[in-house]
Amino acid sequence: MERTYLMVKPDGVQRGLIGQIISKFEQKGYKIVGLKMMQISREVAERHYGEHAGKPFFNGLVDFITSGPVVAMVIEGKDVVTTAREMMGATNPLKAAPGTIRATFGVDVGRNIIHGSDSLESAQREIGIFFKSEELIDYDRAIDTWIYE
């Protein structure tokens, strides 16, 4: 099974959307294997968004992601990286497909509620930034036989 990294950004936390967002992934059948609320330091934010260093929006992105608490999580399931991205919707909420998290809750590209890894490689890197291996829990769920063949 694949794992991916998701983060409810400060706007999602401040607006009280944590539970609704987590529920969408659980209802889809994905298993949460790591979950924590945290305040991201500037150093961690710069490492996380390192691929954007030097771009005009980099400092604003780092400022925003460190402006309040976030909820970091790792979810597991079949094709979870691709499907989670589809569930989140386009980066710009105004262009996101109806029913996606960003279309439902977002109103501005700079306040788009959630981050999700865009590839397996990114997921592994981001999980390593935000979680120690002992913080990720492997466990069996009774419902898995009803979700996967």
UniProtKB/Swiss-Prot annotation:
The keyword Kinase applies. Belongs to the NDK family. PROSITE patterns: NDPK, NDPK_LIKE. The keyword Zinc does not apply. Homotetramer. Its cofactor is Mg(2+). This is Nucleoside diphosphate kinase. Keywords: ATP-binding, Cytoplasm, Kinase, Magnesium, Metal-binding, Nucleotide metabolism, Nucleotide-binding, Phosphoprotein, Transferase. ATP binds at K9, F57, R85, T91, R102, N112. GO terms for molecular function: ATP binding; metal ion binding; nucleoside diphosphate kinase activity. Its EC number is 2.7.4.6. It catalyses: a 2'-deoxyribonucleoside 5'-diphosphate + ATP = a 2'-deoxyribonucleoside 5'-triphosphate + ADP; a ribonucleoside 5'-diphosphate + ATP = a ribonucleoside 5'-triphosphate + ADP. GO terms for biological process: CTP biosynthetic process; GTP biosynthetic process; UTP biosynthetic process. It is found in: Cytoplasm. It comes from Desulforamulus reducens (strain ATCC BAA-1160 / DSM 100696 / MI-1) (Desulfotomaculum reducens). GO terms for cellular component: cytoplasm. CDD domains: NDPk_I.
